[in-house]
C-alpha cells in the first residue's frame, strides 16, 4: 500500500524530466518512505520478486564486498552488466559486441561463467568500485581510517536506540563525482541513505 501511495503521489505531483539515459522520468523532490520493520518486510506485491536474489544482494552489501562473484555464483544477475561493460571498454570490444545485441548477450553469459569458474579472472574484472558494501562497512575517512557504518548502527541500537543519528549513508561525497564520470566501476548507490 505504501509503495502504491508513493506511485500515485509521483503520478499526481511529479514533474516530467529528461535525464542522462534519455528515457525520461517523472519525479518528485524528496519523498520520505517510512516502514515499520516490526510489522512487516517492505516487499513489493505488485510484481514477482526474486526474494533469494534480494537476500543474497543484501548479505553481499553487509559483508562489504564489491566484487560480484558471490552474486553470480548465487544466480543474482542484476550487477552483471556493469562489470561486463567495464570489461568491454577496457579491452576495446564495444564495437565487436554492441550493447543488447545477440552477440553481446551470448558473450556476457560466457563472461559470467568465466567469473564463476576462474578466481583470477573474477578478481580482475568483477570489482564494482566504492559502492554499497564499501560505503556501508569500509567508508574511507579523511585520515585514512575505515568506518563501518553498519557496526556503528548496531552498537547504537543496543546502547542508544532513541538517537536520531542512527543512519547509514551510501554516498561518500568525496567520491561521488568520480563515480559519476568514470566508467571503470558502477555508478553511485541508488539508495543514498537510510535511517
Regions found by a protein language model. Give the residues of each.
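Terminal, non-catalytic protein-protein interaction segments that mediate quaternary/complex assembly
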Residues: 1-195
